[in-house]
Amino acid sequence: MRFRKVLLLFLLTATATTVVAQADIEEKNRRIVQTAFDNWRRSSGSVFDLLASDAKWTIVGRSVAAGTYQNRRDFMDQVIVPFNARLSTPLVPTVRNIYADGDTVIVLWDGAAMAKDGRSYENTYSFFLKMRDGKIVSATAMYDPIAFDDLWKRVRPVY
């Protein structure tokens, strides 16, 4: 009987330790991503600074940019750089909510900027960011493809 009590106590302690460690990792990842968005809002960085060099980025849906980019460089060169080259002001993010679950951080946010043709660009995004050692190792992004594609087709990038 004593052995069972000791075993039960051990299992409960081990489970509690695992739960606390998991909560610590979730909170740490959530803070890292929140800080990156805060920096982006202040024009002193962006969430893309967190991308590991081999991070995969997937844009779901039927947007002109939809697909999976196999690494940071491809994603930045094929999506972010040409996107920013269509804007006359930086995209400013406003985070609605950030959630963390395990190694994944989910961010719901709105972005607004002025396009080079003088029209405003506004969109709502959801990013599902898988984190490891403070870096994004894979991401899935969703946004309004009509707003994104309108900007992409309407405004020629100027580098």
Model-inferred region functions:
Residues M1-L7:
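Bacterial N-terminal signal peptides that target proteins for export
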Residues S53-A100:
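A solvent-exposed, acidic/Ser-Thr-rich amphipathic alpha-helical stretch
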